[in-house]
């Protein structure tokens, strides 16, 4: 584990340092210098996101980790989480549909943990699916609330679906390998600790949909 994580941290850090050294030493000037600065900025944010995921995973698997479970209106919470993604969808030129019901849906959950679940699932689409469209819906089904995050990207091969929530697992070459391989593992563990379940369906070249189910109160 540590060997893999060390490699995944050192590689983007080395790249970041390389771009900054080129700017600092004057090897690049003018427009090229500005481009190097922008690339370095993006690499720094990528590295921050990666480290955030690492902290989440280690915290989740530590003996000190506890969830603050309380009764929460999940529809409103979901809308508040997703509204922050709308400017990013526009920036990425990603078509999107968000359909969250107006009626009150009460669930026992940890608000921060649920936010991490939603954010990781959306980020997974942006980082790995190569999708042009994302659809996020919520519905009731047999005393459960279902959150579906669906994209029309490259899909996930059938042989990979059973491993998708495993720690450090990365899919086939059709999907982007960018990332820690921990994001979906964190999602799965977080959902289970809140008494829910998560599943995935996919067809190569057509779609992938993650379905989070949590019991209604």
Name each model-derived stretch.
Residues 151:
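Acidic ATP/Mg2+-coordinating residue in the GHKL
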Residues 133-143:
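Short beta-strand/loop element within the Bergerat-fold HATPase_c
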Residues 156-169:
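Short conserved segment of the HATPase_c
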Residues 124-126:
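Short helix-loop "hinge" at the ATP-lid/N-box region of the Bergerat-fold HATPase_c
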Residues 68-83:
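A conserved beta-strand-to-alpha-helix junction within the catalytic ATP-binding
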Residues 70, 90, 95-105:
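Conserved catalytic submotifs in the C-terminal HATPase_c
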